[in-house]
Amino acid sequence: VVTDPNITIKDSDKNNVVKLFLGISRGRSAYKGTDIMWEAARDICKKYPDKISLRVVEGLPYHEYVKAMKDADIILDQLYSYTPAMNSLQAMSMGIISMGGGEEEGYEIINEKELRPIINVEPSYRSVYTALEHIAQHPEEVTMRRQQSVDYVRKHHNYVHVAKQYEAFYNRLVISK
């Protein structure tokens, strides 16, 4: 994933509305948990209309989708995953927090001991709702998680770093033959 080397994360104002983003891909909604996340987000927005907003997009071309996502603080993605997928990683590279799969096992696999940018949720309405309510009540956490999101992608998913890992793996295979 490519990250903007000049990206800066501004401090969140406690009075700012936390902006949620949900991209819908109709053919994939059922196995991504979009329906559950959407319902929880709608309910939180009703309860905290002055603290949380939700933008939902559907069927956009990729470049328009990325542009639409830019103003978000949090992307709702991959409820049934243990780790962030490419959509979340792209968002995280832009300083957007991922809410979805962020299990400890995922951090252990990549030996990440400090960064915890992802708002990990279990695959249930209650878990998503509770996590969103926490953010509504603690918007001061947004700035830290946004910065950690960028740091996480730079550290573990930078395209040059990943290419070097593939090259090293390939060379080990070739040498072992």
Label each residue range with its predicted role:
Residues 140-171:
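A charged, aromatic-enriched C-terminal amphipathic alpha-helix characteristic of glycosyltransferases
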Residues 66, 88-93, 107-108:
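Short alpha-helical segment that forms part of, or immediately flanks, the ligand-binding pocket
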Residues 62-65, 85-88, 117, 128:
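Acidic, amphipathic alpha-helical patches
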Residues 97-104:
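Short hydrophobic beta-strand element within catalytic cores of glycosyltransferases
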Residues 18-20, 35-66:
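A conserved nucleotide-sugar
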Residues 2-32, 38:
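Conserved donor-binding/catalytic core segment of Leloir-type glycosyltransferases
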Residues 70-83, 96:
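Acidic donor-binding loop of glycosyltransferase active sites
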